[in-house]
Amino acid sequence: MANLGCWMLVLFVATWSDLGLCKKRPKPGGWNTGGSRYPGQGSPGGNRYPPQGGGGWGQPHGGGWGQPHGGGWGQPHGGGWGQPHGGGWGQGGGTHNQWHKPSKPKTSMKHMAGAAAAGAVVGGLGGYMLGSAMSRPLIHFGNDYEDRYYRENMYRYPNQVYYRPVDQYSNQNNFVHDCVNITIKQHTVTTTTKGENFTETDVKMMERVVEQMCITQYEKESQAYYQRGSSMVLFSSPPVILLISFLIFLIVG
């Protein structure tokens, strides 16, 4: 890890040093550097426009470019660009009109639902989170009757599980046991409230289904937890901290 960080540091130092030198090189020419941008004008540093009797370029009476009476570009009476009577750009008022500020976009319900779909903390359940929807697993119960019963009634069983963060458990078995209990309890209460009851066969099948889903949820959460821990270790190593500090110095400087 240290060797990798050192090589990354050397590579970024070389790249950003070259970019920093490029930024500091003076650019030739440019606006107001003394060079004439129009043919037939005076010496460098002189007036960029031909002398007129108080008017704009090619105008006899002080008007704007192509205007006879002091108007803005394309205006006869002092108006702003595209306005006939003294208005600002696109406005009929004075010169202090502000731009029209667009209204803030409204947050759609689709975005709000997507943000709360995965891992949302469920209120009133003591820190439990609701996992993403899963496909119900195909399970064989050992006899044709139960297999057929499961296929015909699987839609009545949960497709999401309740769980707590994996770092609150010492092993997978504890996580799965708690996950199964709270999920079946919540699903049973909700379904019973709607007037539907479960038989012993339903409870048996739900336990098997929810157990498989809780194992899948544990594997998913464990992998995410490990990746977060690895990222923290990487960014806390001295070479990476030095590299990030150097990049910030180059950007700010």
From Swiss-Prot:
GO terms (BP aspect): cellular response to amyloid-beta; cellular response to copper ion; cellular response to xenobiotic stimulus; intracellular signal transduction; learning or memory; negative regulation of activated T cell proliferation; negative regulation of amyloid-beta formation; negative regulation of apoptotic process
Region (Disordered): 26-108
Disulfide-bond pairs as recorded: C179-C214
Residue ranges of the region described as Interaction with GRB2, ERI3 and SYN1: 23-230
This protein's record includes keyword Kinase: no
Membrane topology: Lipid-anchor; GPI-anchor
Prodomain positions: 231-253
Gene3D superfamilies: Prion/Doppel protein, beta-ribbon domain
Region ranges (5 X 8 AA tandem repeats of P-H-G-G-G-W-G-Q): 51-91
Sequence repeats: 51-59, 60-67, 68-75, 76-83, 84-91
Binding site for Cu(2+) 2: H69, G70, G71
Keyword Cytoplasm recorded: no
Pfam family, one: Prion
Keywords: Amyloid, Cell membrane, Copper, Disulfide bond, Glycoprotein, Golgi apparatus, GPI-anchor, Lipoprotein, Membrane, Metal-binding, Prion, Repeat, Signal, Zinc
Coiled-coil ranges from the UniProt annotation: none
Residues annotated to bind Cu(2+) 1: H61, G62, G63
Composition skew (Basic residues), residue ranges: 98-108
Chain intervals with Gly residues compositional bias: 52-95
Subunit organization: Monomer and homodimer. Has a tendency to aggregate into amyloid fibrils containing a cross-beta spine, formed by a steric zipper of superposed beta-strands. Soluble oligomers may represent an intermediate stage on the path to fibril formation. Copper binding may promote oligomerization. Interacts with GRB2, APP, ERI3/PRNPIP and SYN1. Mislocalized cytosolically exposed PrP interacts with MGRN1; this interaction alters MGRN1 subcellular location and causes lysosomal enlargement. Interacts with KIAA1191.
Associated clinical condition: PrP is found in high quantity in the brain of humans and animals infected with the degenerative neurological diseases kuru, Creutzfeldt-Jakob disease (CJD), Gerstmann-Straussler syndrome (GSS), scrapie, bovine spongiform encephalopathy (BSE), transmissible mink encephalopathy (TME), etc.
Family to which this protein belongs: Belongs to the prion family.
Function, as annotated: Its primary physiological function is unclear. Has cytoprotective activity against internal or environmental stresses. May play a role in neuronal development and synaptic plasticity. May be required for neuronal myelin sheath maintenance. May play a role in iron uptake and iron homeostasis. Soluble oligomers are toxic to cultured neuroblastoma cells and induce apoptosis (in vitro). Association with GPC1 (via its heparan sulfate chains) targets PRNP to lipid rafts. Also provides Cu(2+) or Zn(2+) for the ascorbate-mediated GPC1 deaminase degradation of its heparan sulfate side chains.
Protein name: Major prion protein
